[in-house]
């Protein structure tokens, strides 16, 4: 019977499954897996190489070594399949069963599983509520544990040392049980009543008040409940039977010379078997306790080492002094099972070779070497040869191919025709790193690549290699052609702009072609059409740059798709009219009629794609490339040393700078400036000198004087080769030319500080030894940085992909009414990013109204295309609420409307698009372009720090935002609020400029007044912070007592005396509680109230503030009462580049974060402690006050009696995203993270669409903490998926809604907190994740991409999405049928059925 079952088991291999569950294996389950017990440590016989019986490679247990042949050779061949040989006991079957049949070892004494013991938090420890140290002492036979206290004073689980045990024995005899080792722990676990324990803890939870105890109890409840729910038994954490891995998964290979190469696991298993057998023998002999104990301890250690070597104590090493690789090491880390074999496999039908340029290829083609193609397409060739009758058998075909007969090459051509291949360049940082091409057979051994796809691959031809993969099945070929073909990937998924853009030679060629020159041959001609222009150029009658008039025919495409032709005579050049011949119909001539640089060419392709669509764009791109190459060759551009022109002014500029530096040096020596100021000033002088030299140099290079036809001097843009290359954007930049022809400038030391002696020479003049030595620092640092950067950037991408991998578009519309408000990004006086770029391709969340009227311009749920954006710009809208992924209400996915446009395709995103992975790639791919450094503020940066006024750049109207202000006696506005900002808007109400206004700034214009450009609108003292009165009256001193709370000082230079308030730390004794303040009173001595409130005007003076008023002085509103010097807030380093992006996505709390107001109310200060101030916020509605202790050195932005709103900044500093989420909500934190990340990328000139960052933010916000679970299955304080709470809340009445607070998790935490344990385990901390999941019997729904890749099926995205949807429907159907069939049988029917069955059975008997 068993054999029959076994046979059925082997045949029925394909198992359809929907979920995967991980749990603890009971001893019975382990025995059911096993095909026999392993009793001996032997492996194979060294002479015969046959496996030993009952050993680790036993053929009787694991199966035959040769296919269909038993070990002794009695039964051979297929006809005996399934027979079990009576001589050697081996079943005759395939040898591959040795990969799947397991064995087992019956342990003589139970041993604890190290994962559940040592993986923190220790599961056994938590369950037993015993410290880990105590459990370890019991397990490793150092102490006893009481398993049953009986009627004695001993408690269960009490730890006894050897002496205490003997004493207890004397005292109580055998009234109690105490044991040591894993048996003891196993017994305690077995006797636990989980349900009862759980109820007791829950009762205790209600009674307890201590926070730490509460946390611990909650953890225990969760663990015990997961045991109850999953059906795992606690005693299974102690092993009594050890499963043994199939032998072919831990191979033993004979090497020549009689030695063996073996897997480390065999050593580890051998140790366990040896010790186990010895222990059995000792127990049979009834050996002394101490010996048995030692043997048991050694067995426990051997099992530990097998499961996870090195987790406890020293790792066991092999003969080569290296730690042995245990089972845990097999699955974790980069070389482990998950990352090495499941997520990244090597594939068949692939090859790699060096790439060279294929300038004659079309965009969808690549050159494939014949040798390579022959090898890759072998099976296809064999098939074709057989079908066409050239070969009778496959073997013959094989021979023909080996001989490389001529017919083979013809067949190869046929096979390859329209069969796309995929080219991949490592590192594949985004999806454009693999694209499909049609192969063209070429001679040679290098793959030829189309130059325009180099940008997407980030490839160059300096020895890069690429891999070729052949899609085999029809579906694969179809997908390669429809989705991956290079012609279908013209736009970048990161920002929606063309990625197929010409660079280098092509750009230079087009630039040269479209330049004009005065006084060229053929200037002033009138030509009938571009064809004639080309003819004249070819025959040498006119030059390429000659200014001529040409009759041009333009074709315009109207709204109704009709094409209108218009003919004009246009001033242009010969070159531009030749270029016009390749521009597709439908584009305006103005696109070509200018000097074309890299930006304008990209713009031209973009316009072409939006107006004409894919096909014309692809052909246009190819034509641009051919033309560009051709004219770059004709231009004969090359760089010579004479092209590097050094400006004449250079020496003078440097002399002046040296003179200024010597002046500063003198000032320093006479003590007028400090060392730091001197250093900063010197660096500033040199930096500006460098700028001046660069300006002079560029002026010199970029303009040449020429004499025109009338004999007059004229200036025109220069034809200097170096300038042309930089100006066109082909290669090089102003900064590089500056090093060639200007001066190299300031260099940095290895620690990042700037060396104050600059390199005044350039490369044309050459450097002297010292200058050369200084410049080596920078060069080396650059190389070291690059290596670091690549690793860090790769790790960031990996974390991003992991956190977002399961986010897929799953429905069309989630019908949400929420969204986020978009405004243009304005910093200071310039628009960094206009609104159209931020909202293009998004869906409108609520109707956009025409300002001032109530007509709807754009209706809700409209996808904003280029046309709509132009319309919005025309109507001067500068604020739109758009749908966003963050506010999308789809559970386990996102809806298409909230995501908007698929950037790489230009239409609304399709269902099944893996937007999470695309977002992660878009953010991670440019990571290598970011800097690694933290900026130390010095020199140039310190000048920016102290702005003291605002000078506007545009004409417009002044608008103050959330500004409280008073008007002083000079009729100026004085700002008295913290977050005031000032906007300049144009006559249509669009924001042109935006500035922050500090407290105490004087504003020269009132709200709504007009202002002209260049006017100074506001000014303030950047070095002090004033305290300003909002009322007029007379001053009365309170608690201002000389030498107790204040001191009087006189300024040495001016002779003016002033009062300085002492800090609390400087006061003595009783004076510490005095609170110096200024009260404002009227003539009658009564309090004056703050405007609009009933709070008396009283201003408290913080320590170190300076007063220049006397008691009783008359003051007016807007006057300064006291000043605080701001010099104390030291300069902090700014983290920039990659580390900053990583910090934001990991949601790290800054070191000294800004302190925000937790509630709205009035500020006051309570009793101080030694180093801290007590800040009290009293709500206006009279509910509970909020208190917070703030360190004294923190500079506070608020004064006593001031009113703050929830989330206002109380003390400056970098804001913590967690605080923003808690106090200002999801929208604010989204906006914060998006803007901060964009700032870093914008600095490097990298464009990424906001929605990608929003996708990652959505994943960071996917968890929430339950505040009160009401009647639901959730515990208070439990962290769970936000979508689960949303589902629960949608299904309950409004009174029973669950209260929760959203959590912001960093991307690493969020990846590990995913519901899928397979995904989490393959990411990081494999052991911990698997331990946790096994205990709670987790079920993996296989929702994400990663899990499905690991179990080896189609991913639920893209073309695999429909397959998974189908399976889901089938599953639902099955479930409903199952339910209905269960429900339809009544009780009578059931009893009837039973009677019938019994009758039938009786009759049979």
Swiss-Prot record:
Gene Ontology annotations for the cellular component aspect, listed alphabetically: DNA-directed RNA polymerase complex
Gene Ontology biological-process annotations: DNA-templated transcription
Residues that, per the record, bind Zn(2+) 2: 814, 888, 895, 898
Binding-site residues, Mg(2+): 460, 462, 464
Recorded catalytic activity of this chain's protein: RNA(n) + a ribonucleoside 5'-triphosphate = RNA(n+1) + diphosphate
Pfam families in alphabetical order: RNA_pol_Rpb1_1, RNA_pol_Rpb1_2, RNA_pol_Rpb1_3, RNA_pol_Rpb1_4, RNA_pol_Rpb1_5
Gene Ontology molecular function terms on file: DNA binding; DNA-directed RNA polymerase activity; magnesium ion binding; zinc ion binding
Record-listed E.C. numbers: 2.7.7.6
Assembly information from the UniProt record: The RNAP catalytic core consists of 2 alpha, 1 beta, 1 beta' and 1 omega subunit. When a sigma factor is associated with the core the holoenzyme is formed, which can initiate transcription.
Protein family per UniProt: Belongs to the RNA polymerase beta' chain family.
Name assigned to this protein: DNA-directed RNA polymerase subunit beta'
Source species taxonomy: Bacteria, Pseudomonadati, Pseudomonadota, Gammaproteobacteria, Enterobacterales
